[in-house]
Amino acid sequence: YKMTDREGNVWLWQDGNGCRKVTYMNGEFTSVVFKKENNNLPSNNITYISEDEQGRIWIGSHDGIAQVVGDKAVLVEENHDAFKMMSFGKDVFFLSGTGTISLKREGEDSRIVTRLGEGSKVYSTMRLQNDWIVFTEDGSYVFNLRTHQVSRDTELNIARGQVQIDNRGNFWIYNHTGKVWYVNAKTRFVKSFQLIPADKVNYIDEERYHIVHDSRDI
């Protein structure tokens, strides 16, 4: 996996092997290896590396979340099976693989703000303005990043939804039913398409889509 931060540093990682930060400066490449064995990473089981709106780097793992400070990653939340991070202003939210959402603010300890459902497995997420939509085993939940309120999305209550983003930044959701939902990221307009007949979809092990808008808006 690869992530490039705003400073141009490239972060490379593989679950179980820690990560590497690669920097290009003055015509030379240098790198720092973050690994538990090097005492600069709490866990090698990395699930994501993300940058927030303030430019801070967060490393999520199956064993907790760490913030990168200099050339070391400092543990900020233990016993958290990290799935996704979401930045909202100066606030940072962490979502676990079983639907627990925690909040981290500058100068404060991380704290749990809500739990979605009864520990349902999380499949994917997407953001629509101030709403963080989380697709789980038992449908979708809407977490408002400003108010921290949770609701159920009736129009997008899609169990086991997987999200794909097209070349215009809009969302497409599918869940092995042969049906695909289009969501406009700006207007929140939703339209569904039955691309594979429901009685044929079980012949397919895994749905795969590649969605592109062309210059004719098709």
Placement of each model-derived feature along the sequence:
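Carboxylate-rich, polar loop motifs that coordinate divalent cations or form catalytic acidic clusters
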Residues: Y1-I218
